């Protein structure tokens, strides 16, 4: 669960954050793992792209957070942000999803997000509420 900010860094949620917890509730494993617990009040941190690659290159699924820097609609748009994404396993397999712009505005949707994640992780062909598969 990340986005690429204006400086080209990957902004990720820290371990123990509610988003990483929801991914784990759905049966997934949040990557990157080495973000540490919240040392400060911020629930996010920036990672240099090379560090993000080392942490997430072999992830089965990538989820791009479109709520912050704008929605992306294709894997090509992700590759335009950094060509290194072409080497990620999830990109090679077409397992890239994004959130909608409204993701953080609907706090009552946590259960639906967990359900979306569960369906994505289980390869269920279900309608998704907060996630959209990129082509």
Residue ranges of each PLM-predicted region?
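Loop/turn elements at helix/coil->beta-strand transitions in domains of secreted/extracellular proteins
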Residues: 1, 27-29, 57-61, 92-95
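Basic- and aromatic-lined ligand-binding clefts that recognize polyanionic substrates
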Residues: 1-27
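Stable alpha-helical elements in mature extracytoplasmic
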Residues: 15-22, 48, 110-113
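His/Asp/Glu-enriched short active-site or ligand-binding loop at hydrolase and phosphoryl-transfer sites
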Residues: 18-42, 63-66
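Short helices/loops that flank or line small-molecule/ion binding pockets
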Residues: 46-58
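Structured C-terminal subdomain patch of bacterial secreted/periplasmic proteins
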Residues: 61-135
């Amino acid at each position: 669960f990340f986005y690429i900010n204006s400086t080209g860094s990957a902004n990720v949620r820290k371990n123990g954050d509610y988003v990483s917890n929801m991914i784990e509730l759905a049966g997934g494993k949040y990557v990157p793992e080495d973000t540490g617990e919240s040392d400060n009040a911020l629930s996010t941190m920036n990672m240099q792209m090379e560090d993000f690659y080392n942490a997430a290159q072999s992830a089965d699924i990538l989820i791009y957070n479109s709520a912050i820097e704008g929605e992306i609609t294709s894997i090509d748009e992700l590759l335009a942000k950094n060509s290194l994404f072409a080497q990620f396993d999830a990109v090679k397999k077409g397992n890239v999803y994004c959130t909608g712009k409204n993701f953080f505005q609907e706090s009552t949707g946590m259960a639906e997000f967990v359900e979306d994640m569960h369906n994505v992780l289980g390869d269920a062909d279900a309608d998704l509420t907060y996630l959209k598969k990129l082509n």
